């Protein structure tokens, strides 16, 4: 089997630390045939991936991990683009981020005002207008300037204590966005039971297949062997491609969570892409 790790994060994801070239260097050393950068709601590292593929002789499949929702809970879809994602996907990702950030900020400001904190919507809008899509977020920058959140840890603790949750775009819309950008859509880590994200059974996957889902991430560090076998059976029954990857973000002691530690059959994926 020619191995592919089709779920890797670079520093284009806010919670990841690897430079694109670091990923390729490790992938080459570990004998991978192909890899994908699946950064959260970002395709910023794909250009580097396409350039590095020739240097390291490792095939690169441009990708993204889109934050979405299903059944009232967060869910994720992986987009894969044989010819690179079209600019329309960038617009979709930006709109998705902008919408969620504003919804959360409005709810958070209302919460803070209810706690007697002097912060206004007008102040937030001025901060957002200056740098809406940058990191850290406009809400963090505003609360930091006003001395409400001294650092990111304080801000995150404030977020958690508020209990506010805002759902991203519905999963079928994310699937459509992948198709509109010339790619395929794969359900990410369907069995990753964190108590927060949605855990998928065959009925839900079948519903998404009807909505255009192309595949299932069968192989993932969070899946047990039994789950891998069950999701493989579901994928085969529904005619969906089976993908997999390490979901690597930062250096980890668990080998299955590092580059190439979890993988799928590159030729099977390639065959599906070339249909």
Descriptions of predicted regions:
Residues 1-14, 20-30, 44-85, 145-146, ...:
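Charged catalytic cores and adjacent phosphate/nucleic-acid-binding surfaces used
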Residues 7-9, 33-35, 93-94, 123-125, ...:
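A short, structure-level motif marking secondary-structure boundaries and short turns
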Residues 11-12, 37-38, 96-97, 127-128, ...:
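A generic structural signal for short
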Residues 17, 102-110, 115-199:
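Divalent metal-binding pocket/active-site signature
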Residues 17-18, 37:
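An N-terminal domain-cap segment
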Residues 22, 33, 40-103, 107, ...:
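Mid-domain alpha/beta scaffold segments of enzyme catalytic cores
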Residues 36-37, 245:
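Short beta-strand segments at enzyme active-site cores
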């Amino acid at each position: 089997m020619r191995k592919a790790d089709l779920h890797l994060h670079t520093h284009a994801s806010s919670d990841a630390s690897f430079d694109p070239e670091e990923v390729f260097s490790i992938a080459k050393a570990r004998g991978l045939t192909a890899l994908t950068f699946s950064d959260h709601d970002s395709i910023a590292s794909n250009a580097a991936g396409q350039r590095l593929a020739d240097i390291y002789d490792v095939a690169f499949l441009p990708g993204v991990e889109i934050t979405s929702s299903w059944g009232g809970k967060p869910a994720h879809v992986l987009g894969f683009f044989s010819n690179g994602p079209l600019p329309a996907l960038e617009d979709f990702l930006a709109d998705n981020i902008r919408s969620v950030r504003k919804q959360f900020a409005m709810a958070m400001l209302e919460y803070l005002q209810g706690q007697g904190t002097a912060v206004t919507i007008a102040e937030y809008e001025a901060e957002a207008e200056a740098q809406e899509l940058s990191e850290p977020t406009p809400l963090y920058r505003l609360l930091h300037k006003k001395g409400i959140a001294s650092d990111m840890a304080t801000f995150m603790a404030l977020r958690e204590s508020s209990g506010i949750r805002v759902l991203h775009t519905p999963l079928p819309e994310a699937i459509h966005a992948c198709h509109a950008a010339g790619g395929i859509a794969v359900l990410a880590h369907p069995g990753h039971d964190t108590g927060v994200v949605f855990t998928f059974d065959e009925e839900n996957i079948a519903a998404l297949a009807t909505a255009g889902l192309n595949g299932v991430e069968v192989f993932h560090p969070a899946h047990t062997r039994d789950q891998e076998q069950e999701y493989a059976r579901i994928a085969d029954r529904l005619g969906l491609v089976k993908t997999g990857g390490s979901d690597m973000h930062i250096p980890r002691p668990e080998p299955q969570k590092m580059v190439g530690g979890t993988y799928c059959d590159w030729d099977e994926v390639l065959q599906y892409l070339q249909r």
